[in-house]
Amino acid sequence: MKRIGLVFCALLLLLGMGARPAAAYPYYAQMAYDNPREATGKIVCANCHLNAMPTRAEVPQAVTPGQVFTIKVGIPYDLSKQQVLADGSKGGLNVGAVVVLPEGFRLATEAEMTEEQRQETAETYITPYSDAKPNILLVGPLPGEQHQEIVFPVVAPDPKEDPSVAFMKYRVYIGANRGRGQLNPDGSLSNNNVFRAPATGRLVNIATLDSDISDLPAELASLVPPEYELPGTRVLSFESESGIHNLVVPPGPELVVAVGDSVKEGDPVTNNPNVGGFGQVERDLVLQSPDRVKWLVAFLAAITITQVLLVLKKKQVELIQAAEILG
């Protein structure tokens, strides 16, 4: 399952997202982080997906050792929305999710799942975050229209086989995003972000790349990075007291300024094309001992039997007292 998932995701990235995609794919966290959950509790996907959107999660209250159970992650959003793709065109939103399980918990294999669980996960390719962290699960990119809910099949550990695991209450951390990120893994802006004026001054020129980088003057063409050599890329020139400042705006964001407009440093010169976002939730999960459950059932049964016997004894005493009175 892991190999298929990685191949599938790699193909999507190569075919659809361009040279530096800021996508709804948790796999980008693997490039820079050994652990996708920071010490503060924040899942690192939020570092690139700056807009907050809701995430829903269904986690069992308690599980027993060896039990195969499912965690359901809901990723709601307005299906009528379309996002800006890497080339500036519009398209549907993709989704991705990450589930940080307690250590010892892992992804269930197909052989361990029930038929119902196989059907629920048939079109999702879930992989561990790394060989060293099989308790952290990733999925995506997936078409958002068909995957507003993602099911993760999980196996609970057995403390008898793994001494590092105990019967206790644990926390499960879940994050999900829809749409492309606003930042690339290297921290640069993606074309799914707002671009701002680099200096206070006046916009004096807008040069647009129509088909080839040669469309631009040489002094401006050298400013355009290879990943932005796309039709629709614009180079904005601002005249300020310190000289000319240029800003490269890739295709996608729409300009909200025109030549001759005065701007202040940091003012937005494009709209915000982002329609997606990231959300994170936490849930409790108890690893329950079957022996404790058995003893609890036995204890409750004993209490019930004792109460019944007390009622019967009380009735017996009442009958004896009634007979003595009548006699």
From Swiss-Prot:
The 4 large subunits of the cytochrome b6-f complex are cytochrome b6, subunit IV (17 kDa polypeptide, PetD), cytochrome f and the Rieske protein, while the 4 small subunits are PetG, PetL, PetM and PetN. The complex functions as a dimer. The lineage of its organism: Bacteria, Bacillati, Cyanobacteriota, Cyanophyceae, Synechococcales. One of its GO terms (biological process) is photosynthesis. The keyword ATP-binding does not apply. GO terms for cellular component: plasma membrane-derived thylakoid membrane. Keywords: Electron transport, Heme, Iron, Membrane, Metal-binding, Photosynthesis, Signal, Thylakoid, Transmembrane, Transmembrane helix, Transport. It comes from Synechococcus sp. (strain JA-2-3B'a(2-13)). It holds the Pfam family Apocytochr_F_N. Disulfide bonds: none annotated. Binds 1 heme group covalently. Heme binds at residues 25, 45, 48-49. The chain crosses the membrane at residues 293-313. Residues 1-24 form the signal peptide. This is Cytochrome f. Component of the cytochrome b6-f complex, which mediates electron transfer between photosystem II (PSII) and photosystem I (PSI), cyclic electron flow around PSI, and state transitions. Its cofactor is heme. GO terms for molecular function: electron transfer activity; heme binding; iron ion binding. Gene3D superfamilies: 2.40.50.100, Cytochrome f large domain, Single helix bin. It is a single-pass membrane protein. Belongs to the cytochrome f family. The keyword Signal applies. It is found in: Cellular thylakoid membrane.
